[in-house]
Regions:
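Short acidic (Asp/Glu) and glycine-rich catalytic loops that position anionic groups and cofactors
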Residues: 65-66, 103-107, 149-158
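Glycine-rich phosphate/pyrophosphate-binding beta-alpha loops
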Residues: 89-122
Length: 168
């Protein structure tokens, strides 16, 4: 039997060495950054989200917003690379406690079938999954309201004020 999930598989430590990724091509940098952003977004609205996972996810999203464009433009900027490593670690802490969602499940299959980098597959699916999560059946109405409020909060953190919850 192959075990797909076991607590023994979780790492005890993470090494965040920005120097190891300075030679990553821009496409890899962009794809991994989108994966980090998706980890944080999904954890933020996951059923298992709590104050601690929300804080980690929010900080990760802010770091991605500020430093992903910088590392894409200037791959040797160690400070920006360190911030992206921190974003990745924070998003990992958030999703390992809150969970992930539909986006990642679909991105794994899409990426494998069509040979698309995982982060790119996440980015391709994200607008549709965000819309699906924000609008749904009456049975999910309370959870959807919480989700749209959280999406509106992220939109505000990203400087997109002035939108309604539905537009966010």
């Amino acid at each position: 039997d192959v075990c797909s999930s076991d607590l023994e598989l979780l790492p005890d430590a993470a090494v965040l060495d920005a120097g190891l990724v300075c030679s990553a091509p821009p496409g890899v940098t962009a794809a991994t950054g989108m994966d980090v952003m998706t980890h944080a977004l999904e954890a933020y609205v996951a059923a298992g989200a709590n104050d601690f996972t929300d804080a980690a996810a929010e900080k990760a999203l802010l770091l991605v917003k500020e430093y992903l464009p910088e590392v894409y433009r200037s791959p040797l900027d160690l400070y920006a690379r360190e911030r992206m490593h921190n974003a990745s670690c924070l998003a990992g802490m958030a999703f390992s406690n809150a969970g992930l969602g539909l986006n990642h499940g679909m991105a794994h299959t899409l990426g494998q079938h069509f040979h698309i980098p995982h982060g790119t597959a996440n980015a391709m699916l994200l607008p549709w999954v965000l819309a699906f999560n924000a609008f749904g059946s009456k049975a999910r109405e309370k959870r959807i309201n919480q989700t749209t409020e959280k999406y509106a909060r992220i939109a505000a953190l990203y400087g997109m004020d002035g939108f309604s919850k539905e537009e966010s």
